[in-house]
Amino acid sequence: MRTNRLSRRDFLAAVGTCGAGAVVASAAGGVSGEGQKVKLSTPHAEKIGWRLCCQLYTFRDRTFYEAMEVLAGLGIRRVEPAFFLPLSKEQPDLKTSEMLAPAQRRELKRRLEDRGMLMASYYAPLEADTSGFRKVFDFAKEMGVETLVAEPPAQVFEALDSLCQEYKINLAIHNHSEAAGSKYWRPENVLRVCEGRSKAIGGCPDTGHYVRTGLDPSECLKKLQGRMICVHLKDVAEMGNPESRDVPLGEGKANYTQVLKTLRALNFRGLVTIEYEHLSPQLVEDVAKCVKFVEDFAATVDV
């Protein structure tokens, strides 16, 4: 995600015969019809404790409610909205955030429940001003969020840790690239702010931003062993280029088979969140390829 640049039985059968293109067709209107519960597309990933999610910055060219229907077609039940992204086409200035009015929150919860979907995580505005933190946690609790994803400054972690324990909600520290000015561009910086804090605070390593910085994502994950709460799954075309575009998992420089092997070797269990930043004409197909890559790998793992 670059916030400074706002500018699945059916699935598996389809993928096995026709590849990701078949998934796109189902996303357009087949596997999980409007109003029906989402048919999970990643049963093997679930068996090894990888609960697939999607960061909705991926679909920032549409609203939350529009993106929900795409994800339903892809068999993805869990979503991670970002506080600056629009909720509905009818009210484009309305953001999916703690600023929603009670009636709007009820409508959001109802739509998620009707689809059998979960707001598992939330990319939240947790910055230097602590005055709005409780409002963020109240919203997260109401929506059933298990993990807040953010990049807070070091001085607010005491307040955040207290709220995490009170609300029983995790805080996962996200990284952008070094060139983007992220405080957490390397895992050591994440571990430093976790020192002395409860296990409710940990990392949300973004593998794509590690590659953009010129770091080996698998080695970065190893450094975060025992302190990873969730992971942003992302592959990019070029190593060490901060402007390099996203590509489907396994097609870039992250060595994504090794990334998944590393997560498995570390016995990681939790949210694995696809985030795809490149608004390509074949965006849904590219995301479907990412889903397939994770599920295909998980299918090879002995449980």
Name these PLM-found stretches.
Residues 80-81, 121, 149, 273:
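Structural recognition of the beta-strand scaffold that forms the well-ordered cores
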